[in-house]
C-alpha cells in the first residue's frame, strides 16, 4: 500500500517505513503528525484518486529531526562592469518517518 500526499507545496509518494525530508513543520521532535491531504491511495489493485483529496484518508508520521539542507550558492553577475554579488541560502527541513497509511 502506498499513497501520494501533498505537504509544503510538494507531492510525495510514500509507503509505511519511508523516511522523508519535507518542508519545515512547527512540530517538536517525537510528535506524531497526520497528513489529511492525500491525493491518491493505492492498495494492491485498488486505486483511489481524490478530487482533489481522498475522503477520510490520512497518513500518520513521526517527526524524527529538524535541520537545514546544504547551501545553495546564488551569483549575480553584470558583464563588463566588474560587478559580482554572491549569496547563499539554506532551506530548513523536517525529517519524518511514515508510520501508518489508512482510510
UniProtKB/Swiss-Prot annotation:
One BP term from GO: translation
Cellular component annotations (GO), alphabetically ordered: cytoplasm; ribonucleoprotein complex; ribosome
This protein's UniProt keywords: Ribonucleoprotein, Ribosomal protein, RNA-binding, rRNA-binding
Superkingdom of source: Bacteria
Gene Ontology terms for molecular function: rRNA binding; structural constituent of ribosome
Subunit structure: Part of the 50S ribosomal subunit. Contacts protein L20.
Family statement: Belongs to the bacterial ribosomal protein bL21 family.
Function: This protein binds to 23S rRNA in the presence of protein L20.
Protein name: Large ribosomal subunit protein bL21
Organism expressing this protein natively: Legionella pneumophila (strain Lens)
Gene: rplU
Amino acid at each position: 500500500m502506498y499513497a501520494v500526499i501533498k505537504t509544503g507545496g510538494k507531492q510525495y509518494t510514500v509507503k509505511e517505513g519511508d523516511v522523508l525530508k519535507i518542508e519545515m513543520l512547527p512540530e517538536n521532535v517525537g510528535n506524531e503528525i497526520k497528513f489529511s491531504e492525500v491525493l491518491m491511495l493505492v492498495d494492491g489493485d485498488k486505486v483511489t484518486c481524490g478530487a482533489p483529496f481522498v475522503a477520510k484518508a490520512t497518513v500518520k508520521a513521526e517527526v524524527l529531526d529538524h535541520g537545514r539542507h546544504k547551501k545553495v550558492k546564488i551569483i549575480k553577475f553584470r558583464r563588463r562592469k566588474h560587478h559580482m554579488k554572491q549569496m547563499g541560502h539554506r532551506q530548513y527541513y523536517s525529517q519524518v518517518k511514515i508510520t501508518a497509511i489508512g482510510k
